Amino acid sequence: MAKAKFERNKPHCNIGTIGHVDHGKTSLTAAITKVLAEAGGATFTAYDQIDKAPEEKARGITISTSHVEYETPNRHYAHVDCPGHADYVKNMITGAAQMDGAILVVSAADGPMPQTREHILLARQVGVPAIVVFLNKCDMVDDPELLELVEMEVRELLSKYEFPGDDIPIIKGSALAALEDSDAKLGKEAVLELMKAVDAYIPQPERPVDQPFLMPVEDVFSISGRGTVVTGRVERGIVKVGEEIEIVGIRETQKTTVTGVEMFRKLLDQGQAGDNIGALLRGTKREDVERGQVLCKPGSVKPHTKFKAEAYILTKEEGGRHTPFFTNYRPQFYFRTTDVTGVVHLPAGTEMVMPGDNVAMEVHLIVPIAMEEKLRFAIREGGRTVGAGVVASIIE
């Protein structure tokens, strides 16, 4: 069978299901594909197809993730679902499957559980912009007051982690009812209502090309008679010939002008997100720029040395450390294109971090790096990856 052509005529959005084990994340994912397939916006993917998620490697970490795609009348969605809790932790921290929004699945019969809390906290730490809640298994709860109680608990928990708990849409239903066609109101109708809420409540992400220009420096050359050329892949935005840019990170921020952009040895008038380019910089000496800095739109990114992060530490089996580490641990932090040494400060009450743990920590780098919230990094020891992290907030 020929692969259906992917029509990009609708805005695209990346979402995922999160929540406690056995609350029905995978069943809901299957139910969404089933209900939308009837409207011609998806291919039904059964539970057992989603559940045997293939393993992927992201930043040297093995993660099992299932991907399904579907569309509503308004949007095209790529949806990720993970089989195990550890896969969620790794996925969210590495950003392997980027989430523009999440569907939090909570069993009405059990209410919020430890991983419900942990996934909400992770969503906050890694900067998931919006959450919609599906209260699942409502066919197992006869008492409407009990349902209200669970809903209140979920809203309080979301507010505790700085999500707008009072405003978040909560849809009551049953993924199983949708899959078995047993109760239209709790099944199919609830799933359609959920997708309406996801369409309306999860904001459309800004495309990389519309964001302010940023390009990590990979290499620097000096071309006699022309000046200094900096190469790299444009991460976001557009850079036009003649524009003023800043060189940020590692040393004092410098301003310069892009006097040429080339790609595949051809001169262009601009480079944009996704392009591998060489940028010719006016009056910049070869020794003024180095790998690990970024070129960016003036004022858009600042260099920082101190930040709070959420990190996942690899297990021995994943090729990570064999032993725990303590506060004042000094590994390298690999941001975009370079390693920078930093010192780890563990939160009060955390004695040590074991391989396989995820942890909130504070990091002090020895030189400043261009960074902002949500920036991903690897933690390395002598070139070997021992962890992955994401900038949760900047201190200075």
UniProtKB/Swiss-Prot annotation:
Region annotated G4, chain positions: 136-139
Region (G1): 19-26
Lineage: Bacteria, Pseudomonadati, Pseudomonadota, Alphaproteobacteria, Hyphomicrobiales
GO cellular component, one term: cytosol
Claim: Magnesium is one of the keywords in the record: yes
Naturally occurring in which organism (per UniProt): Nitrobacter winogradskyi (strain ATCC 25391 / DSM 10237 / CIP 104748 / NCIMB 11846 / Nb-255)
Function: GTP hydrolase that promotes the GTP-dependent binding of aminoacyl-tRNA to the A-site of ribosomes during protein biosynthesis.
Compartments, record wording: Cytoplasm
Segments of this protein annotated with the region G2: 60-64
Region G3, annotated ranges: 81-84
Domain called tr-type G: residue spans: 10-206
Stretches for region G5: 174-176
Oligomeric form and interacting partners: Monomer.
PANTHER family in the record: ELONGATION FACTOR TU, MITOCHONDRIAL (PTHR43721:SF22), ELONGATION FACTOR TU-RELATED (PTHR43721)
Positions bound to Mg(2+): T26
InterPro entries attached to this UniProt entry: EF-Tu_GTP-bd, EF-Tu_GTPase, EFTu-like_2, EFTU_2, G_TR_CS, P-loop_NTPase, Small_GTP-bd, T_Tr_GTP-bd_dom
Xref: CDD domains: EF_Tu, EFTU_II, EFTU_III
EC number: 3.6.5.3
Pfam families noted in UniProt: GTP_EFTU, GTP_EFTU_D2, GTP_EFTU_D3
Family stated for the protein in its record: Belongs to the TRAFAC class translation factor GTPase superfamily. Classic translation factor GTPase family. EF-Tu/EF-1A subfamily.
Name of this protein: Elongation factor Tu
